[in-house]
Each structure stands twice: as C-alpha cells, then as structure tokens.
Amino acid sequence: MMKLDTVIAGGRVIDPSTGIDECTDIGILEGKISEIGDLSKREAASYFDATETLVLPGMIDTHGHIYQHVTGKFGLDPDLVGVHSGVTTVIDQGGPSCMTIGGFRHYLYEKSKTRTLCFISAYLVGGLEGHLYPDLYGPCGVNPEHTIRVARENLDIVKGVKAHAEIGGQSRWGIEVIRTGKEIAKAVDLPLYIHLGQLWPTKDSAEIPDADELIEKLVPLMDPGDMLAHPFTRHPGGFVNQRGDVHPILLEAVHNNGVRVDVGHGSHFSFDVARRVLDAGVVPFTLGADMHGYNVSVPSEEDDEARKSNPFLGVAPFNLTIAMSELLHLGVDLKSVISMVTENPAKVLKMEDELGSLKLGRKADISLLKMENGRFTLTDNSGGKETCEKLLMPAGCFKDGNFFEANSPLVPEKIVA
C-alpha cells in the first residue's frame, strides 16, 4: 500500500455534499484526497492532529476584494484573505474589468497560493478604489461588446458579472447600466451579481429616488442563478423596504424564481436587518465576507485621514469565520452555514465537480476551523453588540495538499464578553 503524503487525524469531518459528519481521518496523496476513514495504521510522511477541529471542504469566499494595488487601497493581499485565513478559494467581486483582467490573471491567478477567480465588472474601470467615483460608473463607462468578448476569452477565471443597483446611481442614470450588465451576463451565460444598498450620494439631495421603486424595476431583470448581494444591509435600497418589511417581490424571486442570495457581509451587515430577513424565510445561498481595505485593519498600513473619511469605512472586526459565527448566533444551523461556504459556492462557479467537496479523488482543498465555546462579543457597523456562545476561528487549511497556517493579520482577535 502506497505511503500517504499527509494524514489529517481525528477531526470532526463535515461535508454537506456527501452527508458525512463524523470524527475520522483524511489521507492526502499527490495533492488529492485519497482516503477517508480510520488511518491510524497507515504510514504517512506527515500527520496533522485535528483533534477538536472542524475539517471541512476548502472554504470558498464568494465576495472578496483582492485585486491589490490595481484597485488602490480597496484591494487586499489575496493570500491574507485566502489561505492564511483558512480559505482556499476567493472570488473577487468586480475588481477586474475588460481592461484589467490580464493583470488579474498574471499577478493573482497565476501567482497566488489561494485559488483566485472573479466576477468581471460590468464597468470599464472595475473596482477602482471601491467605486469611490460614481461618475465613472454611468452608461458612458461601460462597453458591453468589449466586456463580452473578454469574458468569453477568460471563462476559466471569469465566473460571473458584477453590477450595482442602488439609489445613488439611479438618481444619475436610472437603471440603464443594470440592463447593460444583464446583457453582458446573458451573452456569456454567466450569473449576474447585483450589489444592493446605497453606495453613492444621490445627485440631487432634494430629489431622493424611491429605493423601493428601484427594487421593483430590478427584480424582473433577474434570471434563475442570478445573485443579489447584501440582504442584511443597513443602507437604503436593500431587502427591507421603507416600511420595515422584506419586499414581497424579493421573496417571490428567491423562493420561486431561483434567484440566489449572497451575504456579502462587509460593513453592510446589521443584526436588526438580518433578523428581519431571516424571519421572512430568506436563507442566503452563499456567504461572502466582502473584506476590503476600508473595512478591515491592516496593521502595516497607516490609518490615515483619507481612509477614515472613506464612505466604505467599516469599524466592526470581522472575517469569513466571524460572519459564519453571526449566522450561527442568529439561528442558522451549522450544516447550512458550512454549505454556504463550500458546496453552494461551487455550484455558483459551476465547479462542483472540482471544489466544495471532500469526495475521494478531489483536490485536497480542506479548511480547518476551531469551534470555541464561551461568551464572545459580536459587533455590527450600526453599533449593535451581541453576545454569542459559539465562535468559529480559522486554524489553517490545505490547498492542493499543501498546509497553510491561519496567521493572517486580517483574522480578528476574539472578544470575550
């Protein structure tokens, strides 16, 4: 019998794609999962003690901003968001565009330890400084023909199209750009991913558009498989209407028309809104962290005035596992939360035959988490504080069979209540 490269021993293995949830061992050989079961008598080059550790399919963060330097301070180091945070795959949401996808391929996809994919921006400038300059994102800032061509040429890394539906843009150019984004997505048979919640100031503060009306215009454009982001946003124009209820048209889209929901946590998350949306029966399909340079603290960077005044600034500490912990705290069961970062994102990417599972023969992409018990403080960016009793923290990951420690400075310190 061939000697294994690595045995991950004694962890609680949870894989929603196969239904497994038990304490067992995983064997890795030549970068792939070769065995699952009692491997205590198997010879291996290395052993990883996973006692009291959750062993999951490699986690997939469906909403990252990792096009470092090209998108200014907005883009983070992909490996600090990825493998060194226990995450094996990160999807950059709208950072690269038809003009900058080549750089994304060369500097991220080909060189990062983390698997880096993207939803290409519908806009020519991509995610420049996190869309800080609204005038760059109007009808004159899109070129559907060019974006369609470039997306088709890069389908190995382009897995969707990113656009925005929010009242700042609506006040300037209506929903024309959203229609163009849908045109691009449909032409390349990829999902359209729509940001909800106000980003930009309205053009004329005396004539604030009706955020509820925008939702009514948006939803008919969405097809099964398209995605709505930020269901728990504290900003106007999200899932909750001006009366404080979840939009009926959004409930219909999610429950009956196959539209998917991504958490897109970021600095948008509100406990109050999250409870309203979850109580209405909307359970997100995927859980993207939405970390970027203005909502996490990077110790090596100066906390300058420009950063502090940025409209996308967030102060509540979070990462993917904190976002997972918040959903657990709000009553979503562990298996469903794990599905949101494993098998479900793999389906979004149309890569369920490669990612999101611990099936034998798959790439050895494996995330390791610690479930800590106690009393911990969770904070949102509206100032809300809640106490949870279970906190998920990254312990590391294996990517293609290689181990990475969860030593990213972006991993928040736990706050004991």
Where are these regions (language model features)?
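Histidine-rich, glycine-flanked metal-binding segment
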Residues: 1-57
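Divalent metal-coordination and catalytic microenvironments
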Residues: 11, 26, 31, 52, ...
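C-terminal cap of metal-dependent C-N hydrolases
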Residues: 11, 363-415
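Metal-associated gating/positioning segment near the N- to mid-region
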Residues: 41-42, 50-111
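Active-site mouth loops of central-metabolism enzymes
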Residues: 62-73, 131-145, 169, 204-207
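Metal-cofactor-binding active-site regions of metalloenzymes
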Residues: 85-91, 95-96, 111-139, 162-169
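Histidine/acidic residue-rich metal-binding segments in metalloenzymes
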Residues: 103, 142-261, 266-285
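His/Asp/Glu-enriched, well-ordered alpha-helical/loop segment
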Residues: 275-371
